[in-house]
Amino acid sequence: MAAVQLCRTVENVTVFGTASASKHEALKENGVTHPIDYHTTDYVDEIKKISPKGVDIVMDPLGGSDTAKGYNLLKPMGKVVTYGMANLLTGPKRNLMALARTWWNQFSVTALQLLQANRAVCGFHLGYLDGEVELVSGVVARLLALYNQGHIKPHIDSVWPFEKVADAMKQMQEKKNVGKVLLVPGPEKEN
C-alpha cells in the first residue's frame, strides 16, 4: 500500500497491483488502477494486454523467477526495484525446497544485457543503510512532508496487544491482512 500511495504522487500514473481478489477493493481505494488476481490470472499477460509497450517501473517484493518476469515487462529505460524475497516464505514453516527453487531461479543479468536492453535493476534494503544517516533522514523528511500534505497515509489493517503476537503473525502468514499489522505494548483493553 505504501508503494502504491507513493506512485499516486506521480501525475498521470497507471498502477498495476497483484493481490487476491478479496483485496482488490482496498487496492483500488489506495490508487491501484488495474488490480490483478495472481491466483487466477497470469499477471504478465494481463499487463501486456493493457500496456503492450511495457511499464516504466516494477516494484518487486517477491524475488526469484518473478524478478525476471518484472524485468521482461520493462519499457526501454525502465527499472526494476527489488526490495524483498517473499517467494522464500511459502507457509508457516521454512521450506528448504522452496528456498532452493527460489535461489536456483533467481534473476541474473549481465551489464552487457542491461546496456543492450536500456534497462536498469536495483535493490533496496533499509537495513543496509544504517550508516547513511543523512540520506535516510532526507528521505524520512520527504515522506513526512507527503504525509502532512495528505498525499500518503499509512494503511493499518489491525492492532493487536503484544500478548496476541502469535495471532497477529498468523494473520500475516495466512495473507489475511491488507495493510500493516501493529503490535502495541501493555495488557489487552476491554471494550
Description of each model-found segment:
Residues 1-41:
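Mid-domain Rossmann-like dinucleotide-binding core that forms the NAD(H)/NADP(H) cofactor-binding site
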Residues 8, 52, 74-75, 116, ...:
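Short conserved AdoMet
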Residues 12, 65-151, 186-191:
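Glycine-rich phosphate-binding loop and adjacent beta-alpha segment
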Residues 24, 44, 65-68, 166:
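Short, well-ordered alpha-helical microsegments
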Residues 32, 53-56, 165:
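Local beta-strand N-terminus motif with an aromatic residue
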Residues 36, 56-59, 81:
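N-terminal Rossmann-like NAD(P) cofactor-binding module of classical short-chain dehydrogenase/reductase
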Residues 42-53:
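Short amphipathic alpha-helix with an adjacent loop that forms part of the alpha/beta core around
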Residues 144-145, 149-159, 166-191:
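C-terminal capping/lid region of NAD(P)-dependent oxidoreductase domains
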